[in-house]
Amino acid sequence: QASIYDFLNNRKWKTDVYQPNEKIDCSFFLNIDEELGQNVYRASLTIQAARPVYNSTYASPLINFKDDNIVFRYQEFQPLEFNENRVQGNDPVAANLTAVLAYYVNIILGLDYDAFALRAGDVYFKKAQNIVNNAPEGRDVAGWKPFDGVRNRYWLAENLNNNRFALIHDALYTYYRKGMDTFYEDEKAGRLEILNGLNYLNTVQTDNPNSMFMQVFFQGKSNELV
């Protein structure tokens, strides 16, 4: 966990300069489920992130998702390295851990930017797609291909970059920036914009039933929308 913390916090993921209090509230929890061989593990990763709501102490969830199928090689005290131009590195199975972490960092950044400005997260969703396109390949490595299942990293990045799902970005901006951020100043107007954001997502669901993004979004919103 210490190596993951250092990897996530000491690497520069974006070009914008932010104050310490403007950092995204997020957590990554890696749970080792099985040892497959010498220094090779199967694990699950829980990813959580939230966005502060303007003029309140409330943080609205961006994502709360568990990735159940991560296989990687790791030796204690080994530094975690990632090169977006060479995602597979010298050892694809070892590189799979940093590829997964970098992927979700970019997904979180994209969601956060989209929640503040329309389509502002595109650059990060494209970075996530680049990781998918160049993802490590190896025995038991999964989650990067369309045939690995219908609920995986491939499909989440695909949804966020596919123009068929363009209303996702309108929904995120409307829900958070126009809805949640105005809720405490004008509850009626804020609630209306939140509903407008959900209506965008309803259109996405109608046009693309059971998409990966919709599952991820509403899984994170289960308590907020009750």
What are these regions (language model features)?
Residues G37-E158:
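Acidic/His-rich structured neighborhood in mature extracellular/periplasmic domains
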Residues F217-V226:
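Hydrophilic extracytoplasmic domains
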Residues F28-N31, Q129-P136, V226:
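Short, mixed-charge aromatic SLiMs
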Residues Q38, A94-T98, A102, E187, ...:
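Solvent-exposed, acidic/flexible segments
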Residues L109, F116-M214:
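Flexible, glycine-rich surface segments
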Residues Q1-R42, V53-N55:
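Start-of-domain marker
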